[in-house]
Amino acid sequence: DLNKIMMMVVAAMMVTVNANAQVEDLRHEIGVTYGTGLSVVGDGIGEGLGLAIANGMFGGGKFGTETYDEKDFGTLSLEYFYHLNNPRVAIGGILGYATTSQKYRDQNSKVYEGDRTRSYYTVMPSFKYYWVNKEYFGLYSKAAIGATFVHAKANSEKDGKNESATENKTYFAFQASFIGVEGGIKNLRAFVEGGFGEQGIVALGGLRVKF
């Protein structure tokens, strides 16, 4: 009858409100992410900066020197977000770190002559919008802009001489994660994002805690 229908509707509304309240109560969020690659801007500036000081020592390959053992650590980030009264909106910040390295050797003898490293430190205020925000599942987009500080260092052990040089540069940084998917229990979720920027290219993943 009508009374039963009304009671069912009210009960369903109460369950929905309660579920939303549970999500809204979790205002704070801390996450750790890992991504591979840097933006074209960041990689280009870092590469140019590293080459500028390395070429002065090794001749940029002009004098029988070649590079080898190139390593790319990827980008490790720490995120914090605060969820506003609107459960779909969160604001916060991102700290990121990435590093790359390579060694130099004589092209003929293959004798080690030195190395160079580039370290990237990123700080970005960020914004996240949830298209879906359920207790155990979320679908969102994320954007961030800020600055990346690059520290480049080259060491030379060529011809029995030990030399080193460093240089620093700052450039505009950003992250655009077009789509992110998270899932897990109420307070702990794993996630994966597809995007582009200082946190990684194409995809990055991690773990976040909400409280």
Question: Can you say where each PLM-predicted feature lies in the sequence?
Answer:
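Outer-envelope beta-barrel architecture signal
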Residues: 24-30, 87-91, 135-141, 186-188, ...
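Transmembrane beta-strands of outer-membrane beta-barrel pores
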Residues: 34-40, 95-101, 119, 145-153, ...
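Cleavable N-terminal export/targeting peptides
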Residues: 1-27
